[in-house]
Structure formats: structure tokens, C-alpha cells
Amino acid sequence: MLLAIDVGNTQTVLGVYDGKRLLHQWRIATMKHHTSDELRVKLKPLFDSEGIVARCIDGAALASVVPCLTDAWRAAIRHMIGVSAVVCSAETAAGLFEADYPNPREIGADRVADAVAARSRFGSPVVVVDFGTATNIEVIDVRGCFIGGVIAPGIETSAQALFSHATKLGAIDLVDPHAAIGRNTEQAMQAGIVYGEVDRVDGLVRRIFRQLGYEAPVVATGGLATRVAKESGTITAIMPDLTLEGLRLVYETQADSPAELQTESQTRA
């Protein structure tokens, strides 16, 4: 079995795979101060709830956009499971991930994993929209190369900024708005936040298509993907587990090269 972990700025998503099948998935809050011991304490009840024996997991893959947690997670995995995690990057995804980009090393691990999974599933070209703390758009061109994209404030990040700066506007639930014209303050905020995100994404994707000179499938992932995608005019598919799937693919490639895996572990220790 494989443990895949996607460490985001707000949430951390964990999945356990048996071969290509995702057996279990959990979403927990990201706490940037956690030590490896605290992460192990968090993992144990998750495993226990599904009857998973940690030592039965024979591999781990990690994508982290929180540098202070990368080593903590690697240590937690090593001590609890007894394996060295494959840390996703443009380098470890070589062969699955090609980039026509000035500095591939600066591409976030989550963006690499998304691109790997999207290209594997949909071919090239393909566009990924990942709704998280940031709304990321990744563009893979007709050659199969990652060429860049967009990083914008995420829907919840934008909402929190509004709540914190507008004294009379309190926090609301981000439920589906019923109309663009809100009939009270709460409805108006819901319409502005949700439809604003929908139209922002659609507008950016159409600009990307014009720059490319052709259209492509657009796959949405992330915690709010379903809510936005059903109102979108450009999103063509939803894959909530896209990042985890990308981690699985990167791990499978690395697992066939033990020497490379060991080198990666040593260089990041």
C-alpha cells in the first residue's frame, strides 16, 4: 500500500492506495508548528479508524508547499511506517513531467503532481484549476510541457479578506447562491464570492486559450472544485483526487529506481 500526502497551506490531504485504487482519504487542518511526533499522533487515529496497520504500508509520496513541515512529515513517515518518502518535485517527476519554464525548480510540488495526473488522464494539451488556499491554474501545452499558469487568491482566502476588512460584513457559509442579485447582505456576499470566483476562472481560462491559440480540456480539483465547476462555462471535468493521483504516479516511477530514491532521501535529509 502507498500513503500519499498533499500538504497545503490550509489543509493537508492524505490518501492510502492499494495499487491504483484509492482506499481511504482524509482531510485535516495544516498546523505549521507541528513536529514529527505530533504528526505521528495525528496519523495513528486515522489509520486505526480504517484498520490500517502502519507497517503494512510499503511506500509514501509527499507534496508539500509548507517548507517547515516537509522534513517533519518525512521524519514522521520514516518513524511510523519505516520508509523514506518520495518528495514530489520537477526533478523526482522527471519522465512524467516536462517543463518549458525558466526555472522548473520553483514550480510547487502540488502543481507538479496536478500536471502529472492531468496529463496521464487527459493527454495533452490540458489545463488544471486547483481550488485551495490559492487558486492555481496549470497549463500543459500541445507538446505535453508545463508552460506556466496562474496563481491567484483562493475563494476562501478572498472571503476571509473581505470579512476581516469590512466591519459590517460578518463571516458567512459559502453555499451555492440562488441568484446573482442578492436580496439581503448574506445572499449578496454569497453571490459575489462564489460567482466572482466562477467568472474569474472562466475569464482566465479563456484568456489562456487565446494565448495558446487553441482550447483544451479543463479539469478542476481541490476542496471547492465541485461548487465552482457546476457553474463554470469552461471546466469540463472534476477530479477531486487529482493531486494524490499525481503523487501515486510519481512514486511508481521512483519506486522502480531504488538508487535514485535513496539519493533523493539523502539530499533532503
Predicted regions and their residues:
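Phosphate/pyrophosphate-binding loops at sites that engage ATP/ADP/AMP, CoA/4′-phosphopantetheine
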Residues: 43-59, 205-215
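Short glycine-aspartate micro-motif
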Residues: 2-6, 59-61, 126-130, 219
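ATP-binding/phosphotransfer module of carbohydrate and carboxylate kinases, centering on a glycine-rich
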Residues: 2-4, 30, 158-269
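Short glycine-rich, Thr/Ser-proximal phosphate-binding strand/loop in the N-terminal lobe
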Residues: 2-45, 55, 144-171, 175-179
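Short beta-strand-loop/turn "lid" adjacent to the catalytic site in phosphate-handling enzymes
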Residues: 50-107, 143-149, 154-155, 183-194, ...
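Extended, charge-rich low-complexity interaction segments
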Residues: 116-129, 133, 264-269
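Glycine-rich phosphate-binding loop of actin/hexokinase-like ATP-binding domains
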Residues: 27, 124-160, 217-218, 236-243
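Conserved phosphate-binding catalytic cores of ATP/NTP-utilizing and phosphoryl-transfer enzymes
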Residues: 93-126, 248-255
